[in-house]
């Protein structure tokens, strides 16, 4: 195993995604790997939780919510893609992906600011609103 430095927001994001995978994936072998990674990363996050449990859980809940929405949206898009159904629903869902990714980035940025992360994620996209 290698260890890397990452932003606090990225750590929270990864833990939230692993929590979702733990709920959604049924393959036993995959679940073993997911659980191992989740435990490892959660141990790294314990210090952050001890700083302010309420904020920790709030950030995590918000990331789980937006990442669950992304998971469900992308599942639906894949079904439409498989059926070659490039209709209005497909367009709405495709747009939802980047709207929700923008929300996800905002939450991760808030986490980074709250915990004064030395490493931060930066993005730049064409403005659409």
Give short role names for the model-derived ranges.
Residues 1-129:
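Extended, charge-rich alpha-helical interface modules
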